[in-house]
């Protein structure tokens, strides 16, 4: 039977922390070969993505829809986000991709808008920059609390709720698109509004291409 000391020699220290966080690593090391544990771990990660995609298809959530880009790849999703009512983004149908890391849910997915969107917290390449999608732990710049960043309890639904909230209430203090943030602060009902309206119209034209 393997001992805890044997586990320590087989697994790098950084990985010990990861598996301990799962709450099962050291227990499984007593009865499983490390390679078998890794296979079980990846299977567990897959199941965490397989269930929500089925659940969202059966019970859609207002404001967005989600599905796999490729039925054979659980780690790449496509989402359609409806611009929230009573905001400048109302009426928009914005397409985005979620790309999950292999060690999800320990680390967050990346989100990228495919539809053009003008927003302070979305950079010009479409990458979304909000706290919930930032790597877990302390913010070295001190802008975010650990509990505001990624936690393994978050789901696709909580991510999308945060993104919809971001559309309704941009964070101009921590922008990914500095030009959009400047316009949002200084000319919200002028140039910023015109650029958003153009993106909304374009999103409607290309939503189902």
Question: Where are these predicted regions, by residue range?
Answer:
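UBC/E2-like fold recognition across ubiquitin and ubiquitin-like conjugation systems
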Residues: 1-93, 97-209
